[in-house]
A protein has these predicted regions:
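Alpha-helical substrate-recognition element adjacent to the catalytic core
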Residues: 1-73
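C-terminal cap/substrate-recognition subdomain and adjoining C-terminal extension
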Residues: 51-120
Length: 120
Protein backbone atom coordinates (compact mmCIF):
# COMPACT_ATOMS: atom_id res chain seq x y z
CA UNK A 1 0.00 0.00 0.00
CA UNK A 2 0.96 3.63 -0.39
CA UNK A 3 0.77 5.31 3.01
CA UNK A 4 0.81 9.11 3.18
CA UNK A 5 1.97 10.41 6.56
CA UNK A 6 1.80 14.00 7.74
CA UNK A 7 4.91 15.37 9.46
CA UNK A 8 4.04 18.11 11.98
CA UNK A 9 1.71 16.83 14.68
CA UNK A 10 1.85 13.25 13.39
CA UNK A 11 5.48 12.11 13.23
CA UNK A 12 6.62 14.97 15.47
CA UNK A 13 4.99 17.19 18.04
CA UNK A 14 3.52 20.34 16.49
CA UNK A 15 6.23 23.03 16.57
CA UNK A 16 6.30 24.68 13.13
CA UNK A 17 8.43 26.40 11.90
CA UNK A 18 10.82 24.44 14.11
CA UNK A 19 10.84 20.65 14.08
CA UNK A 20 9.14 19.24 17.17
CA UNK A 21 10.16 16.22 19.19
CA UNK A 22 9.61 12.79 17.70
CA UNK A 23 6.28 11.33 18.78
CA UNK A 24 6.71 8.19 20.86
CA UNK A 25 7.36 5.13 18.68
CA UNK A 26 6.57 6.92 15.39
CA UNK A 27 9.97 5.86 14.08
CA UNK A 28 9.51 2.25 15.21
CA UNK A 29 6.15 1.80 13.50
CA UNK A 30 7.05 3.69 10.34
CA UNK A 31 10.12 1.45 9.99
CA UNK A 32 7.89 -1.58 10.52
CA UNK A 33 5.46 -0.45 7.82
CA UNK A 34 8.39 0.16 5.47
CA UNK A 35 9.89 -3.28 6.21
CA UNK A 36 6.53 -4.86 5.36
CA UNK A 37 6.82 -3.39 1.87
CA UNK A 38 4.58 -0.34 2.15
CA UNK A 39 5.59 2.84 0.33
CA UNK A 40 5.80 5.83 2.68
CA UNK A 41 5.06 9.29 1.28
CA UNK A 42 5.56 12.22 3.62
CA UNK A 43 2.65 14.58 2.99
CA UNK A 44 3.42 17.93 4.60
CA UNK A 45 2.57 21.59 4.16
CA UNK A 46 6.28 22.33 4.63
CA UNK A 47 8.12 23.57 1.55
CA UNK A 48 11.51 25.04 0.72
CA UNK A 49 13.93 25.17 3.66
CA UNK A 50 11.20 23.91 6.04
CA UNK A 51 10.67 20.81 3.93
CA UNK A 52 14.45 20.35 4.01
CA UNK A 53 14.39 20.55 7.81
CA UNK A 54 11.78 17.77 7.89
CA UNK A 55 13.79 15.63 5.48
CA UNK A 56 16.96 16.13 7.55
CA UNK A 57 15.05 15.13 10.70
CA UNK A 58 13.70 11.97 9.07
CA UNK A 59 17.14 10.93 7.83
CA UNK A 60 18.81 11.74 11.18
CA UNK A 61 16.25 9.53 12.93
CA UNK A 62 16.52 6.72 10.37
CA UNK A 63 12.87 7.06 9.38
CA UNK A 64 12.45 5.62 5.88
CA UNK A 65 10.32 7.25 3.19
CA UNK A 66 9.84 6.98 -0.55
CA UNK A 67 9.02 10.61 -1.32
CA UNK A 68 8.18 13.92 0.30
CA UNK A 69 5.29 15.90 -1.20
CA UNK A 70 5.49 13.92 -4.42
CA UNK A 71 3.41 11.09 -5.80
CA UNK A 72 4.70 7.64 -6.61
CA UNK A 73 6.23 7.56 -10.13
CA UNK A 74 3.64 5.12 -11.52
CA UNK A 75 0.86 7.50 -10.47
CA UNK A 76 2.59 10.43 -12.15
CA UNK A 77 2.70 8.37 -15.36
CA UNK A 78 -0.94 7.29 -14.96
CA UNK A 79 -2.16 10.87 -14.48
CA UNK A 80 0.32 12.50 -16.86
CA UNK A 81 1.63 14.84 -14.17
CA UNK A 82 2.48 15.09 -10.47
CA UNK A 83 -0.74 16.67 -9.25
CA UNK A 84 -0.83 18.67 -6.03
CA UNK A 85 -2.83 16.06 -4.13
CA UNK A 86 -0.86 13.09 -2.86
CA UNK A 87 -2.55 9.85 -3.89
CA UNK A 88 -2.39 7.10 -1.25
CA UNK A 89 -4.28 4.08 0.03
CA UNK A 90 -4.09 5.36 3.62
CA UNK A 91 -3.59 8.87 5.03
CA UNK A 92 -2.23 9.33 8.55
CA UNK A 93 -2.70 12.92 9.71
CA UNK A 94 -3.39 14.61 13.05
CA UNK A 95 -5.95 16.83 11.30
CA UNK A 96 -8.22 14.00 10.17
CA UNK A 97 -11.91 14.27 10.96
CA UNK A 98 -11.99 11.63 13.68
CA UNK A 99 -8.62 12.63 15.16
CA UNK A 100 -5.40 10.68 15.35
CA UNK A 101 -5.29 7.66 17.69
CA UNK A 102 -3.32 8.24 20.88
CA UNK A 103 -0.40 5.93 20.06
CA UNK A 104 1.53 4.84 17.00
CA UNK A 105 0.79 1.24 17.98
CA UNK A 106 -2.93 1.98 17.50
CA UNK A 107 -2.20 3.68 14.18
CA UNK A 108 -0.17 0.66 13.04
CA UNK A 109 -2.95 -1.76 14.02
CA UNK A 110 -5.53 0.29 12.09
CA UNK A 111 -3.31 0.23 8.98
CA UNK A 112 -2.94 -3.55 9.36
CA UNK A 113 -6.73 -3.96 9.42
CA UNK A 114 -7.11 -1.83 6.29
CA UNK A 115 -4.38 -3.82 4.55
CA UNK A 116 -6.08 -7.12 5.42
CA UNK A 117 -9.36 -5.87 3.94
CA UNK A 118 -7.56 -5.00 0.68
CA UNK A 119 -6.10 -8.51 0.42
CA UNK A 120 -9.41 -10.36 0.92
Amino acid sequence: MVIAIDFDGTITEQSFPEVGALKKDADVYIRRLWSEGHAIVINTCRSGKYEGMAEDFLRANDIPFSYINSNMPHLIVDYGQDCRKISADVYIDDRCLMGLPDTWEEIYNMVQKINQKKIV
